């Protein structure tokens, strides 16, 4: 078992010559001390590259050896006997240390120039017990009170052990070494301790506060007292050099008094004391000019200037017009020149510049909006210049040109050179946003007139459509087969399948009647349950209002209609344009644009009663919509959209569309975003939590947009227009309210045919799959997958 022994070395100051040497340094112990120090190197020699780092001595002795040496490391004497016991050795060592300390203090008082004594304890570890007493020394830590190179002539450049130069040292973070020494050998990084080691060093090491890390070698350097004093002086804002005297007496190396001395000391000439002849001639000329009246005095010149100038009048309140006049004088802006005539204005233009019938018809159609025309005139062709008549709009164009020159303000604008690609928002690729419909898969044919509306069963197996041929057809989606056809007495404007999967009901708006139809498809138990629900009318204790009785009447279907599947008929006093269901399937709303203040009605299926939510009409109602989550009701007029709270019966918000005519709207399944279609070729995306104005206006179609629809599961929405196109777009709504919705147009599906200026009339999504259905004026229903 190894034992760590400690060798203590004390630096003892030289004693005065008149004092005798210590009594305990006898000649008997000199031989033993010399044998002990045979393997010990001179402490003045630097055996390692690390300054100030304590190292251990390996010895096989079982004793603590203590000896004394001078500043240069010469051996002076040994303290204590080798054969004494551990306790006696410790006591004798302590007594000798006290005596040495007293001697050191005494000598420091007598001689201030001598170095102070310091004691260092160096621990030694023994790995295996051996018979030899060989001791390997390590250079002790440097005394902080002394300058590092006070006793040597070593320069700073020679002390630089790391030769990598002035580079960032973090380049060596991934390597085990930190650079190269003068012999081109790697300098290995010192071992790094953890936080516990740092904490123990902070407690045990008294010099921890003055220890810094050298970034070049990674070693820890102990700051001297001079270094600390220098740092303190710099922090306190004083001059770093203590020997510099700030208030030394001023030495005038050069005098501050100006001494004037002549360049040449030549005596004045004799003619310098006589009057100048040239000045005499000049004065005589001026006198002659005054006598002849050619020359005037200063007073006469000032008087003539005052008479010419006349009286001055100043404006008390200066206006902006005067400043503008001065600006026009000093910085005029020339009038813009008219554009040179092009090929279209020629009397014999090329054929491609002449209008065809379609372009001429469109040009005449924009008579009320001439600013939207491509050209302000219609190009004409003549055989010769003699046949060209007088230009009928010449005087008007000259008059408008004069108005532009006279009334239009002129200003210089700095043209910004902005790259067009910088203005285009960066959108993800459509390939990354799949799935979405890309091709036409099925065409459902069977109607003989316009197909106005389409709706899908909640489970996604069947499809219902309504047409102007006064029929309602139920289709099987997978095969395209028409299962049932229900004939009505009037044009079918709208159909809507009940969103509640526990009921099998279709609401059909035909003329002024609302038919509740059981399609008799799907689960037989579900069909029977629906018939039982609609068979008997519930008994109502509440007396209905006269306004409601005159507006709507509930009745069971006749036997002939019962065979077709019609169960309940709700008769309105005006033609119905739209019908929509609440998410739970118990309420449905109808819109009658000609109904004035009774245009919108809400019907409750379970109690067979109706309500008129509004007492006053604030516009021509186009369509209505239920909120999917909250008890809110959306009412769209021609120009605006109002949101009402059905519980509090008050207006919540009014959305400003800035459009001429609203055609339809659809709400996002989460209920925070609304999509509106208009007849003026626009789609408006409203963020209900953000503002009452559109978050984004999309102009994707060339003609009126008839219908829009959100998908219930996927971040998709579609729009149908009279340009026979169905445009599918990606509309991602994030849960983070601080992140705006992502809108990306994906695919344009254009397979419908145009009939009498009509194209796609309605679009609807499959409830489960990313499929979209569209109805058109070509009497077909098309499925895109």
UniProtKB/Swiss-Prot annotation:
One of its GO terms (biological process) is regulation of hemocyte proliferation. GO terms for cellular component: nucleoplasm; PeBoW complex; preribosome, large subunit precursor. Pfam families: BOP1NT, WD40. WD repeats lie at residues 446-487, 489-527, 571-613, 616-654, 657-696, 700-739, 755-785. It is found in: Nucleus, Nucleolus; Nucleus, Nucleoplasm. Residues 1-11 have a biased composition (Basic residues). Residues 45-54, 61-73, 85-102, 150-159 have a biased composition (Acidic residues). Keywords: Nucleus, Repeat, Ribosome biogenesis, rRNA processing, WD repeat. Residues 1-160 are annotated as: Disordered. Residues 103-112 have a biased composition (Basic and acidic residues). Disulfide bonds: none annotated. It comes from the Eukaryota. SMART domains: BOP1NT (SM01035), WD40 (SM00320). InterPro entries: BOP1/Erb1, BOP1_N_dom, WD40/YVTN_repeat-like_dom_sf, WD40_repeat_CS, WD40_repeat_dom_sf, WD40_rpt. One of its GO terms (molecular function) is ribonucleoprotein complex binding. Belongs to the WD repeat BOP1/ERB1 family. Required for maturation of ribosomal RNAs and formation of the large ribosomal subunit. PANTHER family: RIBOSOME BIOGENESIS PROTEIN BOP1 (PTHR17605:SF0), RIBOSOME BIOGENESIS PROTEIN BOP1 BLOCK OF PROLIFERATION 1 PROTEIN (PTHR17605). This is Ribosome biogenesis protein BOP1 homolog. The lineage of its organism: Eukaryota, Metazoa, Ecdysozoa, Arthropoda, Hexapoda.
């Amino acid at each position: 078992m190894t034992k760590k022994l400690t060798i203590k070395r004390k630096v003892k100051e030289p004693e005065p010559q008149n004092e005798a040497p210590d009594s305990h340094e006898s000649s008997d112990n000199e031989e033993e001390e010399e044998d002990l120090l045979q393997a010990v190197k001179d402490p003045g020699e630097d055996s390692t590259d690390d300054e100030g780092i304590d190292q251990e001595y390996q010895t096989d002795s079982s004793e603590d050896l203590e000896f004394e040496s001078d500043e240069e490391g010469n051996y002076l004497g040994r303290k204590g006997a080798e054969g004494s016991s551990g306790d006696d050795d410790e006591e004798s060592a302590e007594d000798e240390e006290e005596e040495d300390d007293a001697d050191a203090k005494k000598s420091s008082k007598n001689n201030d120039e001598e170095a102070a004594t310091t004691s260092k304890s160096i621990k030694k570890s023994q790995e295996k017990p051996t018979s030899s007493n060989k001791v390997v020394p390590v250079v002790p830590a440097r005394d902080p009170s002394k300058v590092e190179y006070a006793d040597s002539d070593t320069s700073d450049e020679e002390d630089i052990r790391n030769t990598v130069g002035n580079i960032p040292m973090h380049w060596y973070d991934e390597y085990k070494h930190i650079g190269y020494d003068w012999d081109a050998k790697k300098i290995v990084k010192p071992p790094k301790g953890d936080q516990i080691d740092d904490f123990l060093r902070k407690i045990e090491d008294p010099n921890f506060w003055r220890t810094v890390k050298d970034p070049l070698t990674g070693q820890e350097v102990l700051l001297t007292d001079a270094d600390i004093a220098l740092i303190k002086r710099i922090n306190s804002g004083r001059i770093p050099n203590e020997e510099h005297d700030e208030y030394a007496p001023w030495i005038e190396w050069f005098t501050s008094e100006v001494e004037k001395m002549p360049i040449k000391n030549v005596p004045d000439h004799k003619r310098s004391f006589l009057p100048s002849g040239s000045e005499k001639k000049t004065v005589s000329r001026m006198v002659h000019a005054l006598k002849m009246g050619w020359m005037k005095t200063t007073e006469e010149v000032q008087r003539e200037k005052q008479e010419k100038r006349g009286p001055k009048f100043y404006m008390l309140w200066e206006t902006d017009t005067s400043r503008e006049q001065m600006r026009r004088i000093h910085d005029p802006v020339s009038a813009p020149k008219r554009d040179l005539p092009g090929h279209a204005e020629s009397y014999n233009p090329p054929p491609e510049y002449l209008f065809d019938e379609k372009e001429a018809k469109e040009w005449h159609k924009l008579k009320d909006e001439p600013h939207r025309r491509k050209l302000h005139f219609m190009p004409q062709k003549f055989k010769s210049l003699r046949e060209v008549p007088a230009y009928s709009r010449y005087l008007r164009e000259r008059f408008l040109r004069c108005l532009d020159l006279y009334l239009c303000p002129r200003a210089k604008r700095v043209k910004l050179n902005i790259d067009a690609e910088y203005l285009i928002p960066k959108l993800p690729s459509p390939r990354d946003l799949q799935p979405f419909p890309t091709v036409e898969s099925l065409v459902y044919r069977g109607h003989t007139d316009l197909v106005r509306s389409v709706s899908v069963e909640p489970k996604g197996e069947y499809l219902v459509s309504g047409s102007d041929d006064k029929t309602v057809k139920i289709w099987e989606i997978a095969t395209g087969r028409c299962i049932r056809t229900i004939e009505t007495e009037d044009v079918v404007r709208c159909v809507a399948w009940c969103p509640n999967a526990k009921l099998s009901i279709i609401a059909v708006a035909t003329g002024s009647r609302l038919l509740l139809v059981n399609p008799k498809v799907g689960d037989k138990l579900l069909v029977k349950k629906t018939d039982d629900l609609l068979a008997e009318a519930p008994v109502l204790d509440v007396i209905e209002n006269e306004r409601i009785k005159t507006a709507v009447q509930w009745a069971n279907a006749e036997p002939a209609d019962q065979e077709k599947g019609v169960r309940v008929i709700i008769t309105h006093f005006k033609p119905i344009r739209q019908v929509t269901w609440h998410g739970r399937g118990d309420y449905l709303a109808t819109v009658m644009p000609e109904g004035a203040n009774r245009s919108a009605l809400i019907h409750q299926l379970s109690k067979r009663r109706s309500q008129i939510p509004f007492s006053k009409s604030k516009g021509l109602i186009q369509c209505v919509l239920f909120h999917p989550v909250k008890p809110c009701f959306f009412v769209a007029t021609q120009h605006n959209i109002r949101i009402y709270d059905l519980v509090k019966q008050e207006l919540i918000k009014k959305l400003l569309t800035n459009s001429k005519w609203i055609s339809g709207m659809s709400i996002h399944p989460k209920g925070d975003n609304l999509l509106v279609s208009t007849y003026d070729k626009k789609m408006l995306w409203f963020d209900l939590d953000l503002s009452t104005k559109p978050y984004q206006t999309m102009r994707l179609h060339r003609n009126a947009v008839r219908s829009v629809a959100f998908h219930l599961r996927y971040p998709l929405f579609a729009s149908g227009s009279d340009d026979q196109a169905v445009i599918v777009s990606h509309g991602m709504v994030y849960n983070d309210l601080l992140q705006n919705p992502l809108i990306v147009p994906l695919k344009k599906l254009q397979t419908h045919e145009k009939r009498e200026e009509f194209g796609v009339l309605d679009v609807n999504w499959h409830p489960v799959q990313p499929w979209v259905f569209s109805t058109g004026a070509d009497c077909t229903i098309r499925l895109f997958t």
